Amino acid sequence: MSLTLKQADQASLSMQSLPKHVAIIMDGNRRWYRQHQAQCSIKSSSGHYYGAKVLPNIIESAFSLGIEVLTLFAFSTENFLRSAEEVAELFSLFHAQLDEQLPYLIENKIRLRCIGNLLALPPDLQQQIAKVASETQRHGMRELVLAINYGGKDELVRAFKKLHHDLVNKKISLDSVSEELIRLYLDTSEIPDPDLLIRTGGEMRVSNFLLWQIAYTELYVTDVLWPDFKPYHLLDAIKAYQHRSRRGGK
């Protein structure tokens, strides 16, 4: 995104109603690859290589526009059911993107946080995630959150197991259990719930993503497939968000 476009579009946004936390379901890589396979110079098992090329521009654009937390649904618990070739490609891309984004995150004082069942990931990927998280942990004003091996139902199961453990060991009482207490056991306990959830690829579902956290989140679905998603598509989503009236169930 050019500096001119950033300046013009930033001026068109209302800073008072800017979403603080934007989450994105990055869907459509495989459909995009089927449509463009003949023109692709890099052969990919599923198109994720081309989806990954979009990431740096979207990440930079989101934070330059004033977004404080950007959460990306990178790999679901169900994705392990895909072919070994596709899963291996995704893990390889995670390694590459973590290496590529680290200097940007450090330079711009952005913290990396990963959510999900990380213990089920390959040990080398766990180590790299821990390294990048450690090198950016002193930053807290802005955060890039990657959901890796994440599922909303799985998160709740893990949270309730931890809560049950504390109940049994009398660290908490049954009377103390509340929505706010449960929230403290979630992967996202230290970040606000999303204000805006964007889904690319046109599918009208949330795909087991942040089920607890998106109770009052504004949803925006675009038919644009993820590898075609540009900064101006992100801006369109934010502008649509700013024209809505958020009532939080009231």
UniProtKB/Swiss-Prot annotation:
Enzyme Commission (EC) number: 2.5.1.-
A single GO BP: polyprenol biosynthetic process
GO molecular function ontology, one term from the record: magnesium ion binding
What sections of the sequence does the record tag as coiled-coil? Answer: none
Extract the InterPro entries matched here. UPP_synth-like (IPR001441), UPP_synth-like_CS (IPR018520), UPP_synth-like_sf (IPR036424)
Q: Which cofactor does it need?
A: Mg(2+)
In which residues is substrate bound?
28-32, 48, 76-78, 80, 82, 199, 205-207
Cofactor annotation remark: Binds 2 magnesium ions per subunit.
Q: Name the positions where Mg(2+) binds.
A: D27, E218
The record ties this protein, via Pfam families, to: Prenyltransf
The family database entries (PROSITE patterns) matched by this protein are listed as: UPP_SYNTHASE (PS01066)
Asked whether the UniProt record includes Magnesium among its keywords, one would answer yes
Residue positions of the active site: D27, N79
Protein keywords = Magnesium, Metal-binding, Transferase
Q: Superkingdom of this entry's organism?
A: Bacteria
Does Nucleotidyltransferase count among this protein's keywords? no
Class in the EC hierarchy, top level: transferase
Q: What does the subunit comment say?
A: Homodimer.
**Role noted for this protein:** Catalyzes the condensation of isopentenyl diphosphate (IPP) with allylic pyrophosphates generating different type of terpenoids.
User: What family is reported?
Assistant: Belongs to the UPP synthase family.
Q: Which HAMAP family is this protein grouped with?
A: ISPT
What name has this protein been given in UniProt? Isoprenyl transferase
- Record organism: Chlamydia abortus (strain DSM 27085 / S26/3)
